[in-house]
Amino acid sequence: MLSLTAESCELFNIPFYQFAQMKKFCPEDIPAIKADYKLHWDNWKAIIQSVSAQLGTPFAKPHIESWTNGWQVRAHFFAYFKYEFNQNSAAIFSVLLNRRRLRVCLDWHCYRADRSQINVQQYNQWLDQFDFKQFADFEIWREDESEYDDFRQVKVISEKNLILRSDEDFWCIGKSIEKAELNQIDPVLFITHTIQQLQPLYDRCHQ
């Protein structure tokens, strides 16, 4: 079984991410850091590809961000899914592994917003007639909250908490597993099931 553990998160607990800094302060560690990243990323890639196989139609091939951009290693592993016919949309099912947790959510991909087939106001349509009961156990957070923050559950917020502060404001909704609990789950099933539960909200973004 493809698995994630606390060690998968601890990969990101390094003092420097940029190779220039590593060369200056810990050059002898670079080969091991690269090898560790590649090993864990290959496992991450296999997990995401297995999720893709489980999801099937109408999902497009996932985007899996590389473990390095050439001048630094990543502070997290990131992948996202979209429908085949929404490839140009900035609304995504985001899957992220960082030093704290595994997180799966409906997200607005800001970097793609200027080329998106929908705008952020259309993305926010998932908030219309939001079913607080159905998503009670999901976590929800504003776009400017850190990926390392404690997230609130839907069950502890009310409709007035969801009011948008500006035209560019948005919420993310999803589920996460803290690193200490990762060895208790099947990540492929967890990611697949969470995305499937979020599909009705994703569909509403594109109405």
UniProtKB/Swiss-Prot annotation:
Cited Pfam families: HI_0552
Protein name according to UniProt: Uncharacterized protein HI_0552
Organism: Haemophilus influenzae (strain ATCC 51907 / DSM 11121 / KW20 / Rd)
Taxonomic placement: Bacteria, Pseudomonadati, Pseudomonadota, Gammaproteobacteria, Pasteurellales
